């Protein structure tokens, strides 16, 4: 039975050594990494970790845009028994300062990142900087190539276990200081197995990596799913090349928050000249126009398109339906990924769907969604009080208010802490009101 990331990496290296796992693009050129090449790089860096640190459990930071060496750095630290702390390339200096200090970070992998000028000013004393290939740092640092070269062909001695702590994913949620959500091999792989079953992912499926890997959704749904399903990941060069890179991948699965789907919508409308022109084209040849748009976007091979992380305006979903592009809604959070998703065979627009297999769901007297399932986080790093508030008797208190319709479909109605009382003493949920305004394409953000 495969219970760790390294189990999957070893399996695909053994069965499909020459199959491409990762594809990077730079302009008109591409760089491919097969399973055997990735396996060699990951294990070489894991061996360097073992040569450098006498004990496991060191905090290892990762600050870079999405690229193959993000995966290599991540999995090498896990393979050596250390704890990866991914950080956003847009995070302000004070946030990265807090995360590095709070976790007692010993190593920081540095790739291309737009916030380096801020981060370098708050680096902890004695931290080891490792520059990923192609990155030059003015500060004293080590180079990836120099570290792995002596160990290529070697294997680390450490044997990963399913309950090993492999990552701290920091999230501030809606209030308070950032909390480090603890993730183990199991708390990553069990939800990924649910995704794979629910989305009917096939072995060798293609994935498109463009959202920040510091976010749990990108890390599990793309990196993790590709590892579990022997998939092929295409990295987006940058957001300005999204419409070029996506058709070159033609993914089987894609995840995006509503804002991404809105931006793609605006791009389509701009190509036609106006929404009226879109309507006229669809009226004249709905099937032909739909096929053309699916192919142009690179979504013609997509088996499952997920929109989540924020409320999706129903009008946006209906708009995509006209092109034969079916957006599915779902719910998850860093503490418990993917417990509720929509399914193609039964979709209700506006609903996040129904609980996935082996997931228990309960609604509290305050209408808060509670989730119990294998694969949830064990809690918050070094925050026992916050852990006790959220994880109670095996139930994760999500902080989201829900309602359930007569057919068992779940709907998010707002956050527990967002409700406020008017001067007349009436409780008001701002989210449904805000959602009405966000259906207007000229509205980007709104707050009541």
Question: Can you say where each PLM-predicted feature lies in the sequence?
Answer:
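Structural core segment of the AMP-binding/adenylate-forming
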Residues: 10, 52, 79-146, 444
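Conserved pre-ATP/AMP-binding loop-to-beta segment of ANL
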Residues: 17-20, 131, 151-170, 177, ...
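Conserved AMP-binding/adenylate-forming core of the ANL superfamily
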Residues: 21-75, 92-97, 143-146, 185-186
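Conserved AMP-binding A3 loop
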Residues: 32-36, 166-192
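ANL superfamily adenylate-forming
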Residues: 114-162, 268-296
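Conserved AMP-binding/adenylation subdomain of ANL enzymes
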Residues: 189-209, 213-292, 298-301
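Gly/Ser/Thr-rich phosphate-binding loop
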Residues: 252-256, 266-347, 360, 444
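Conserved ATP-binding/catalytic segment of the ANL
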Residues: 355-422, 427, 439
């Amino acid at each position: 039975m495969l219970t760790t990331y390294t189990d999957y990496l070893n399996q695909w290296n053994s069965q499909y050594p020459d199959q491409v796992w990762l594809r990077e693009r730079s302009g008109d050129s591409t760089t491919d990494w097969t399973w055997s090449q990735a396996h060699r790089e990951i294990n070489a860096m894991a061996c360097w970790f073992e040569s450098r640190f006498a004990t496991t459990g060191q905090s290892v930071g990762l600050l870079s845009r999405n690229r193959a060496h993000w995966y290599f750095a991540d999995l090498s630290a896990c393979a050596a028994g250390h704890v990866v702390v991914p950080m956003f390339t847009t995070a302000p200096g004070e946030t990265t300062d807090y995360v590095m200090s709070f976790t007692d970070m010993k190593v920081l992998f540095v790739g291309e990142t737009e916030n380096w000028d801020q981060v370098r000013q708050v680096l902890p004393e004695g931290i080891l900087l490792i520059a990923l290939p192609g990155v030059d740092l003015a500060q004293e640092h080590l180079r990836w190539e120099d570290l792995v070269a002596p160990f290529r062909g070697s294997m680390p001695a450490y044997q990963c276990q399913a309950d090993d702590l492999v990552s701290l994913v920091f999230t501030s949620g809606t209030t308070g200081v950032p909390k480090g959500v603890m993730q183990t091999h199991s708390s990553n792989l069990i939800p990924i197995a649910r995704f794979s079953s629910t989305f009917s992912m096939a072995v060798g499926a293609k994935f498109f990596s463009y959202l920040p890997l510091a976010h749990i959704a990108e890390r599990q749904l793309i990196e993790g799913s590709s590892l579990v399903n022997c998939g092929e990941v295409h990295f987006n060069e940058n957001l300005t090349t999204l419409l070029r890179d996506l058709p070159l991948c033609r993914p089987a699965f894609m995840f995006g928050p509503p804002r991404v789907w809105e931006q793609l919508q605006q791009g389509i409308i701009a190509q036609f000249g106006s929404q009226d022109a879109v309507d006229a084209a669809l009226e004249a040849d709905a099937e032909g126009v739909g096929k053309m748009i699916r192919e142009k976007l690179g979504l013609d091979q997509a088996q499952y398109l997920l929109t989540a992380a924020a409320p999706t305006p129903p009008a946006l979903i209906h708009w995509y339906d006209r092109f034969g592009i079916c957006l599915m809604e779902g719910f998850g959070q860093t503490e418990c990924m993917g417990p509720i998703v929509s399914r193609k065979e039964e979709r209700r627009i506006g609903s996040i769907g129904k609980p996935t297999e082996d997931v228990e769901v309960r609604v509290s007297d305050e209408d808060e969604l509670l989730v119990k399932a294998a694969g949830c986080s064990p809690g918050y790093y070094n925050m026992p009080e916050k852990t006790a508030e959220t994880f109670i008797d095996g139930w994760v208190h999500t902080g989201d208010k829900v309602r359930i319709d007569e057919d068992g479909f779940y709907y998010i109605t707002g956050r527990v802490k967002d409700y406020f009382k008017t001067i007349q003493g009436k409780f008001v949920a701002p989210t449904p009101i805000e959602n009405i305004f966000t259906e207007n394409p000229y509205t980007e953000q709104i707050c009541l």
